[in-house]
Amino acid sequence: MMLGVIGGSGFYTFFGSDARAVSVETPYGPPSAPITVGTVGDHEVAFLPRHGVKHEFSPHTVPYRANLWALRSLGVRRVFAPCAVGSLTPDLGPGSIVVPDQLVDRTSGRDDTYFDSGGIHVAFADPYCPTLRAAATGLPGVVDGGTMVVIQGPRFSTRAESRWFASQGFTLVNMTGYPEAVLARELEMCYAAVALVTDLDAGIEVGSGVRAVDVFAEFERNMPPFKKLVFEALEAVEVERTCTHCLTHSGVQLPFELP
């Protein structure tokens, strides 16, 4: 069973020249980019850059439904989602790698379901797959747990927003973690975010606040060890999928067949 990786800002490639590119059409249009398929350990792995190969898509315009549908149609059932995040606590500085266990949605107007009809309601109390999380958090230096609040973007938070997020106990702030996680759940795909802290958010940092140029520079600085960690997380996953946490449609009549 194929594994998937959805790369975030600055994470546009994953394999060498021996990987094959696959173009996939979906009922929701094309995904962000052609999907590349290669091998990591005992696994066949499909890689998709969330924002496109040249960062064509801002967080609010990413074709999330097409991306997840395309991966599932290729046989992907388990997905790691590397992403860039801001930290809402000084305890997690730039370069920290965190595997969150909770998510808060503060986006608006995004296409966040495949079930516009049919009365389908997925369980989402625990948004991330515990098996995939364990594979990543078992690696050295990875912080286990935390709440990631997802904002609409593409702008960064005001200081007041950032301080409010921190006061609620949120740990990380991001722009792409939703609806990606819930769409994966609707397609019964195991999903776990792996977050690289690129900055202290505006309510924590002094000076001018968060700047995109600094975020991308920090991500680029940390890309080699971050990619290495994702490779190691993939290698740590069992070949056969045994997790049932994300199989949310048992006994439910769906309005269409999943790919």
UniProtKB/Swiss-Prot annotation:
<dbReference type="GO" id="GO:0017061">
    <property type="term" value="F:S-methyl-5-thioadenosine phosphorylase activity"/>
</dbReference>
<dbReference type="InterPro" id="IPR010044">
    <property type="entry name" value="MTAP"/>
</dbReference>
<dbReference type="GO" id="GO:0006166">
    <property type="term" value="P:purine ribonucleoside salvage"/>
</dbReference>
<keyword id="KW-0328">Glycosyltransferase</keyword>
<comment type="similarity">
    <text>Belongs to the PNP/MTAP phosphorylase family. MTAP subfamily.</text>
</comment>
<feature type="binding site">
    <location>
        <begin position="50"/>
        <end position="51"/>
    </location>
    <ligand>
        <name>phosphate</name>
    </ligand>
</feature>
<feature type="site" description="Important for substrate specificity">
    <location>
        <position position="157"/>
    </location>
</feature>
<feature type="binding site">
    <location>
        <position position="176"/>
    </location>
    <ligand>
        <name>phosphate</name>
    </ligand>
</feature>
<protein>
    <recommendedName>
        <fullName>S-methyl-5'-thioadenosine phosphorylase</fullName>
        <ecNumber>2.4.2.28</ecNumber>
    </recommendedName>
</protein>
<dbReference type="GO" id="GO:0019509">
    <property type="term" value="P:L-methionine salvage from methylthioadenosine"/>
</dbReference>
<keyword id="KW-0660">Purine salvage</keyword>
<feature type="binding site">
    <location>
        <begin position="199"/>
        <end position="201"/>
    </location>
    <ligand>
        <name>substrate</name>
    </ligand>
</feature>
<dbReference type="Pfam" id="PF01048">
    <property type="entry name" value="PNP_UDP_1"/>
</dbReference>
<dbReference type="InterPro" id="IPR000845">
    <property type="entry name" value="Nucleoside_phosphorylase_d"/>
</dbReference>
<comment type="pathway">
    <text>Amino-acid biosynthesis; L-methionine biosynthesis via salvage pathway; S-methyl-5-thio-alpha-D-ribose 1-phosphate from S-methyl-5'-thioadenosine (phosphorylase route): step 1/1.</text>
</comment>
<comment type="subunit">
    <text>Homohexamer. Dimer of a homotrimer.</text>
</comment>
<feature type="binding site">
    <location>
        <position position="175"/>
    </location>
    <ligand>
        <name>substrate</name>
    </ligand>
</feature>
<feature type="site" description="Important for substrate specificity">
    <location>
        <position position="212"/>
    </location>
</feature>
<feature type="binding site">
    <location>
        <position position="9"/>
    </location>
    <ligand>
        <name>phosphate</name>
    </ligand>
</feature>
<comment type="function">
    <text>Catalyzes the reversible phosphorylation of S-methyl-5'-thioadenosine (MTA) to adenine and 5-methylthioribose-1-phosphate. Involved in the breakdown of MTA, a major by-product of polyamine biosynthesis. Responsible for the first step in the methionine salvage pathway after MTA has been generated from S-adenosylmethionine. Has broad substrate specificity with 6-aminopurine nucleosides as preferred substrates.</text>
</comment>
<dbReference type="GO" id="GO:0005829">
    <property type="term" value="C:cytosol"/>
</dbReference>
<dbReference type="InterPro" id="IPR035994">
    <property type="entry name" value="Nucleoside_phosphorylase_sf"/>
</dbReference>
<keyword id="KW-0808">Transferase</keyword>
